[in-house]
Curated annotation (Swiss-Prot):
InterPro entries: Anth_synth/Amidotransfase, AS_beta_subunit, Class_I_gatase-like, GATASE, TrpG/PapA_dom. Pfam families: GATase (PF00117). It comes from Halobacterium salinarum (strain ATCC 700922 / JCM 11081 / NRC-1) (Halobacterium halobium). This is Anthranilate synthase component 2. One of its GO terms (biological process) is L-tryptophan biosynthetic process. Its EC number is 4.1.3.27. Part of a heterotetrameric complex that catalyzes the two-step biosynthesis of anthranilate, an intermediate in the biosynthesis of L-tryptophan. In the first step, the glutamine-binding beta subunit (TrpG) of anthranilate synthase (AS) provides the glutamine amidotransferase activity which generates ammonia as a substrate that, along with chorismate, is used in the second step, catalyzed by the large alpha subunit of AS (TrpE) to produce anthranilate. In the absence of TrpG, TrpE can synthesize anthranilate directly from chorismate and high concentrations of ammonia. It catalyses: chorismate + L-glutamine = anthranilate + pyruvate + L-glutamate + H(+). Keywords: Amino-acid biosynthesis, Aromatic amino acid biosynthesis, Glutamine amidotransferase, Lyase, Tryptophan biosynthesis. L-glutamine binds at G57, P58, G59, S137, L138. It is an enzyme of class 4 (lyase). PANTHER family: MULTIFUNCTIONAL TRYPTOPHAN BIOSYNTHESIS PROTEIN, MULTIFUNCTIONAL TRYPTOPHAN BIOSYNTHESIS PROTEIN-RELATED.
């Protein structure tokens, strides 16, 4: 399986690479290619990905230099190639498909929050109210109708994950690749299982 990670210049990117590489399918670890968000869409396509992961990163999704090729990938690749957006990856997807992203009332950096979810897709066989690591000062304030909200903070006040209704695109606001997220390997594994079955 070929996995492309679009790196939005985040310190967690290589944690994602490690988590992906630790998930063999058919006795083979995924081949992971990391492309900076300054890469071209042609470079992403040339890597012939079976799956794409859009990394976290600093900045705002409405600032082109902060997300680079991410927006092109979301529009041109994600409709057919299974894609997982993480943190900025989720914010970029919401923004690109017509939602809004704003400042959080309280920035969350290195804190955990219990997450409730729909027990499907990337959350299949994952415990309810698992602790999820959060490192973000932005939140998705309106979710486009093309997405289903699949996870929230326990009180339901903030979306923590979404899934596109028609495309193989799932996104999480939290960081599955952080050691503070106890089920991170399982979330990544469920994503890779879905990608392999696509």
């Amino acid at each position: 399986m070929n996995v492309v990670v679009v790196d939005n210049y985040d310190s967690f990117t290589y944690n994602l690479v490690e988590y992906l590489s630790a998930q063999p399918r058919d006795d083979h670890a995924p081949d992971v290619t990391v492309l900076k968000n300054t890469a071209s869409l042609a470079a992403v396509r040339a890597a012939d990905p079976d799956a794409v992961v859009i990394s976290p990163g600093p900045g705002h999704p409405d600032t082109p230099r902060d997300v680079g090729v991410t927006t092109d990938v979301l529009r041109a690749v994600s409709p057919r190639v299974p894609t997982l957006g993480v943190c900025l990856g989720m914010e970029a997807a919401v923004h690109e498909y017509g939602g809004t992203v704003g400042r959080a009332a309280e920035p969350m950096h290195g804190k955990t929050t219990p997450v409730s979810h729909d027990e499907t897709g990337i959350f299949a066989d994952i415990q309810q109210d698992f602790p999820a690591a959060r490192y973000h000062s932005l939140v998705c304030t309106s979710i486009p109708s093309c997405f289903a909200v699949t996870a929230t903070t326990r009180d339901g006040s903030l979306p923590m994950a979404i899934r596109h209704r028609d495309h193989p695109l799932a996104c999480v606001q939290f960081h599955p690749e952080s050691v503070l997220t106890g089920v991170g390997h399982d979330v990544i594994g469920n994503f890779l299982d879905a990608a392999a079955a696509h």
